From Swiss-Prot:
Glycans are attached at N68, N239, N473, N505, N578, N631, N689, N694. Expressed by the venom duct. One of its GO terms (biological process) is proteolysis. Venom dipeptidyl-peptidase which removes N-terminal dipeptides sequentially from polypeptides having unsubstituted N-termini provided that the penultimate residue is proline. May process promelittin into its active form and/or modulate the chemotactic activity of immune cells after the insect sting. Disulfide bonds join C450-C453, C463-C481, C659-C770. It holds the Pfam family DPPIV_N. Its EC number is 3.4.14.5. It is an enzyme of class 3 (hydrolase). Residues 1-23 form the signal peptide. This is Venom dipeptidyl peptidase 4. It comes from Apis mellifera (Honeybee).
Length: 775
């Protein structure tokens, strides 16, 4: 649900070669040895710092280079030389590199990516891609035999949504027209085996998710899982036959006769309370050409027939573990299957106060590690912890909390089997905005150790927002520090000693040195029985004797946060330094990482408590700080944030906010997808929570928006939050004769990635009018 405006990433990929290993992809690399030759950028006005301008906050001027390699082995990283285009293999222990693939091989392919087979003898080249849904692309695939220098087109040269190499063979598993194929390469040719024959484009999906599973459950375009030995393939099938369509009109190019009639795009999209996809799980022996599909049935006696497949992965060769939930996702059953279809229900979990937050489990010998809410011993309630269970006599027993206290596990990353250690991302004590890399012994005898907390950025500040990319077995990792300063990446060994610098983003740092920066202040504000986090960006020349307009950016979706330590240089940098507007973020009830009590306040009542907090906390700031101009206070948000902005204006009886913008907003939860909405709201039926849906429908509350300046912005081709949402609010406002502005972007999707100049110039004019600065 959360909007991920991926324009920057897309532009990088469009102009670059991408390296992939085992389905992972990263942008093209700038050769570390060559970065020193980048010319120094001249500072503006003979060294004087200048404000950010609007255009450079959306045109990638201040985009950081990311980790632009992919681990191939436990000590080697694949990357693309940015200057000559060769694919190189870099040994982090010796500092030496070798060329694996000459740039001439991919020179004739458009928008190329490469994925190497297990022994580097074959290369799958993805090219000529078009975007699918949020995470998926459809591309042509050509396999190059390095020894014979021959090319083989996959799927007759058609675009395909997914391909992966076997981990142990020169064999490619791919999906074509929603069926799975297995193609084995050998000297002189290849053999192809069709694994499924039930696929129907846009209706029955084998090995890839449909729209709702890609967006809301898997967060990935991948729905097949290869066993570690490469012998077996488990995969999901999504049957959308009974799922209703959303119809999107694509209008095409102005004046083009081919677009005399709009083109209709139909997408299977289950809305709240409607029929969901029917999902099944299967496994097959890839090495035995005569093998048949084996069904891995869901535990319908526990989660019901209308269930959700949340996770699936291999515990070890021959054993796959799947997590199934009921439709509203508050009951979950872990099932252990063997490759003959035998099933064993090994662990059950139920959440009575809210919804389940499920992550794929990790494994070590007899241990299974899951993320589970555990009591913190404080009034904040339970926190998501790494929890170790032992598989014994067909069940998971002996639960051990590996990360006790009031810190939250954000993501389980990897188990280092040689050292019996778990790596994970988590918050810091009392600091939910911090994201650190931790490790903890699986024995449970030692407290977690923060591995990123003592790492210093080039500016000398402690790293407070980290991620890690691990090598095959976890003996090395790339530590990615994204805050509080620009991205800095170091290569670290298993003893947690930094052995090299991968990326310092020196060019970005030089450019930032020529810009004035906001003054950042963090506050705790007590409201509605909780301590709420507030972050304000103040103008560089801030004077507390003056009054400044305030603009709040809001998301406020369940289990999300807006206040983090990540360094960003977006719209806030412009409006604060160039327009002297205070920019604010508020994390109230329903936000993440502060305990289950605060989190589950939002359960079954979206659009209530999180909206109240935005209003009351902003009013508190206005009353406490004389330098905030209460007559020039606005709010804006995108996606769920657009919903929040609209609901704030509709329910703000005291007119704390004078104006607002909603970009691609939900306006009624009956129009949004089932798997997201029902997780937090239940079903829109009289027997369940129909009244909750009605209470949170913005179109039923438009009278509260009268007299306030409001702008609606939406793209007509939004496959996530449909244009219908905005049109229904439009109709309610018009029927009530309430004035508002609307900007429609023809054929634009949820991210509005093709119209940023017009979008931000439009919003800038709106804010100039509302907040009182000259445009």
């Amino acid at each position: 649900m959360e909007v991920l405006v991926q324009l920057a990433l897309l532009l990088v990929v469009h102009g670059s070669l991408v390296v992939l290993v085992a389905g992972k992809s990263v942008p093209r690399v700038i050769d570390q040895d060559l970065e020193r030759y980048e010319p120094l950028e001249e500072e503006d006005h003979r060294g004087a710092r200048v404000p950010f301008n609007l255009e450079e906050t959306y045109d990638q001027s201040f985009r950081a280079n990311s980790f632009n390699g992919t681990w191939k082995t436990d000590r080697e990283i694949l990357y693309s030389d940015n200057y000559v285009g060769d694919i190189r293999l870099f040994d982090v222990t010796t500092g030496s590199g070798t060329v694996l693939l000459d740039s001439s091989v991919t020179a004739d392919f458009d928008k190329a990516s490469v994925m190497f087979s297990f022994d580097n003898s074959h290369v799958a080249i993805g090219h000529d891609y078009v975007n699918g849904f949020r995470y998926s692309i459809h591309q042509k695939c050509t396999v190059y035999n390095i020894k014979s220098r021959t090319f083989t087109d996959i799927a007759n040269g058609d675009r395909i949504p997914l391909f992966k190499w076997s981990p142990t063979r020169n064999a490619l598993i791919y999906v074509h027209k929603n069926d799975i194929y297995y193609q084995v390469f050998f000297e002189g040719g290849s053999d192809t085996r069709r694994i499924t024959n039930t696929g129907v484009p846009d209706i029955v999906f084998n090995g890839i998710p449909d729209w709702v599973y890609e967006e809301e459950v898997l967060g990935s375009p991948v729905a097949f899982w290869i066993s570690p030995d490469g012998r077996h393939l488990a995969f999901a099938t999504f049957n959308d036959t009974n799922v209703r369509d959303i119809v999107i009109s694509k209008y095409g190019s102005p004046g083009n006769s081919r677009d005399q009639y709009p083109n209709e795009i139909r997408i299977k999209y289950p809305k709240a309370g409607t029929t969901n996809p029917f999902v099944s799980l299967s496994v097959i022996d890839l090495h035995d050409p005569s093998s048949k599909l084996i069904d891995l049935p869901p535990p319908v006696d526990v989660v019901g027939a209308d269930n959700v497949l949340y996770t699936a992965n291999w515990r070890r060769d021959g054993e796959i573990v799947a997590t199934w939930t009921n439709r509203v996702q508050n009951k979950a059953q872990l099932v252990l299957y063997d490759t003959k279809g035998n099933a064993n229900n090994i662990y059950y979990e139920e959440e009575t106060e809210g919804w389940l937050r499920i992550q794929p489990p990790l494994y070590h010998d007899r241990y299974v590690i899951v993320a589970k809410l555990q009591d913190s011993g404080t009034k904040a309630g339970r926190f998501l912890h790494a929890t170790r269970l032992e598989y014994r006599n067909g069940a998971l027993v002996d639960e051990t909390d590996l990360t006790p206290g009031t810190c939250e596990v954000i993501s389980l990353l990897l188990v280092d089997h040689a050292r019996a250690r778990l790596y994970y991302l988590g918050t810091e004590l009392g600091k939910p905005s911090h994201k650190n890399l931790y490790s903890v012994q699986l024995s449970g005898n030692e407290p977690p150790v923060c591995l990123s907390c003592d790492v210093l950025t080039p500016e000398g500040n402690r790293c407070t927002y980290a991620y890690a990319y691990f090598s095959t077995n976890g003996s090395h990792y790339a530590l990615y520090c994204a805050g509080p300063d620009p991205v800095f990446i170091a290569i670290v060994n298993a003893n947690h000693r930094q052995i090299s610098i991968w990326e310092e983003n020196r060019s970005l740092r030089r450019k930032l040195a020529a810009r004035t920066q906001p003054i950042v202040k963090n506050f705790n504000v007590n409201a509605n029985g909780y301590t709420n986090k507030v972050k304000l960006y103040l103008p560089p020349d801030f004077d507390e004797t003056k009054k400044y307009p305030l603009l709040i950016t809001v998301y406020a979706g369940p289990n999300t946060i807006r206040i983090t330590e990540e360094a960003t240089y977006g719209f806030e940098s412009y409006i604060v330094t160039n327009r002297s507007v205070i920019y604010g973020r508020i994390d109230g009830r329903g936000s993440a990482y502060k305990g289950s009590k605060m989190l589950f306040e939002i359960y079954r009542r979206l659009g209530t408590v999180e909206i109240e907090d935005q209003i009351i906390i902003t009013r508190t700031l206005q009353e406490k700080y004389s330098w905030i101009d209460s007559n020039r206070t606005g709010i804006w948000g995108w996606s769920y944030g657009g919903f929040s902005a609209a609901m704030v204006l509709a329910t703000d009886a005291e007119s704390v906010f004078k104006c607002g913008i909603s970009v691609a907003p939900v306006t009624s939860w009956i129009y949004y997808d089932s798997l997201y909405t029902e997780r937090f709201m239940g079903l829109p039926t009289p027997e369940d929570n129909q009244s909750g849906y009605n209470d949170t429908d913005v179109s039923r509350r438009v009278e509260g928006m009268r007299g306030k300046k409001y702008m609606l912005i939406h793209g007509t081709a939004d496959d996530n939050v449909h244009y219908q949402q905005t049109m229904m609010l439009n109709k309610a406002l018009v029927n009530s004769d309430i004035m508002f502005q609307q900007q429609t972007y023809t054929d634009e999707a949820h991210a509005l990635g093709n119209v940023f100049p017009h979008l931000y110039h439009t919003t800038d004019r709106f804010w100039a009018n509302c907040l009182g600065y000259s445009h």
